[in-house]
Amino acid sequence: MELFLAGRRVLVTGAGKGIGRGTVQALHATGARVVAVSRTQADLDSLVRECPGIEPVCVDLGDWEATERALGSVGPVDLLVNNAAVALLQPFLEVTKEAFDRSFEVNLRAVIQVSQIVARGLIARGVPGAIVNVSSQCSQRAVTNHSVYCSTKGALDMLTKVMALELGPHKIRVNAVNPTVVMTSMGQATWSDPHKAKTMLNRIPLGKFAEVEHVVNAILFLLSDRSGMTTGSTLPVEGGFWAC
């Protein structure tokens, strides 16, 4: 199915690894013009070699002022993928201020800031656009040791709906994708233990974790005009986890 993304300028955060990197690669293959944002210069350097022509931006999105400097003059952006996130997992009784602050700075506050920058540009140009927020199955189901992470993703789902409500009159669609575990470097850090993985897999009717391409395909669909009547949605890519 043709998604007609060629020539569109797309900003992707968390572009250095995992889902973000896969999204950049897929967008580049469609002919889209990609602005790839990561806090790790080495990841951006290797990504530029793989996808010549993309525009790399190295910034820590947890730093509001640095983000404003890096992206405030990024130029016209048609589509946005808010993928950057951290997963600092602690038992509830051991949650630290540092983990809480860092998690909400990157997983929620940065989404607001980057989306404001992109949406204001779209509105000023008088053109439609689309934003996809990468959330999680943890936004709607509790997982042990994920109290802060689950909270950031639950907040992100509601933010997605409010953004859709307020930006809809400007013809800007906003949706979320909610994947199950994906065995990226972040996923492996948490779920590589077979016993722990089994406890999660037992809650997934399809009995498997997601691949990066499963999530990327959902993101590209929501960016494209093929989903032109879809906004404010949370699209599960979780093998039926929410059905249980």
Curated annotation (Swiss-Prot):
Leader sequence segment: none
Catalytic activity annotation: xylitol + NADP(+) = L-xylulose + NADPH + H(+)
Enzyme class: oxidoreductase
Omega-N-methylarginine modification, residue list: R21
Residues binding substrate: S136
Membrane-protein topology: Peripheral membrane protein
Alphabetic keyword roster: Acetylation, Carbohydrate metabolism, Glucose metabolism, Membrane, Methylation, NADP, Oxidoreductase, Phosphoprotein, Xylose metabolism
Subcellular location per the Swiss-Prot or TrEMBL entry: Membrane
PROSITE patterns: ADH_SHORT
Location of N-acetylmethionine modifications: M1
Pfam family, one: adh_short_C2
Annotated tissue distribution: Highly expressed in kidney, liver and epididymis. In the epididymis, it is mainly expressed in the proximal and distal sections of the corpus region. Weakly or not expressed in brain, lung, heart, spleen and testis.
InterPro entries cross-referenced by the UniProt entry: L-xylulose/Carbonyl_redctase (IPR051737), NAD(P)-bd_dom_sf (IPR036291), Sc_DH/Rdtase_CS (IPR020904), SDR_fam (IPR002347)
Binding positions for NADP(+) per the UniProt entry: 11-40, 153
Gene3D superfamilies tied to this protein: NAD(P)-binding Rossmann-like Domain
GO molecular-function term, one example from the UniProt record: carbonyl reductase (NADPH) activity
EC number: 1.1.1.10
GO CC annotation terms, alphabetical: brush border; cytoplasmic microtubule; cytosol; extracellular exosome; microvillus; mitochondrion; nucleus; plasma membrane
GO biological process: D-glucuronate catabolic process to D-xylulose 5-phosphate; D-xylose metabolic process; glucose metabolic process; NADP metabolic process; positive regulation of reactive oxygen species metabolic process; xylulose metabolic process
Record SUPFAM superfamilies: NAD(P)-binding Rossmann-fold domains
Subunit structure: Homotetramer.
Protein family per UniProt: Belongs to the short-chain dehydrogenases/reductases (SDR) family.
General function of this protein: Catalyzes the NADPH-dependent reduction of several pentoses, tetroses, trioses, alpha-dicarbonyl compounds and L-xylulose. Participates in the uronate cycle of glucose metabolism. May play a role in the water absorption and cellular osmoregulation in the proximal renal tubules by producing xylitol, an osmolyte, thereby preventing osmolytic stress from occurring in the renal tubules.
PANTHER family listed in its UniProt record: D-ERYTHRULOSE REDUCTASE, L-XYLULOSE REDUCTASE
Entry protein name: L-xylulose reductase
Species of the source: Homo sapiens
Lineage: Eukaryota, Metazoa, Chordata, Craniata, Vertebrata
Gene that encodes it: DCXR
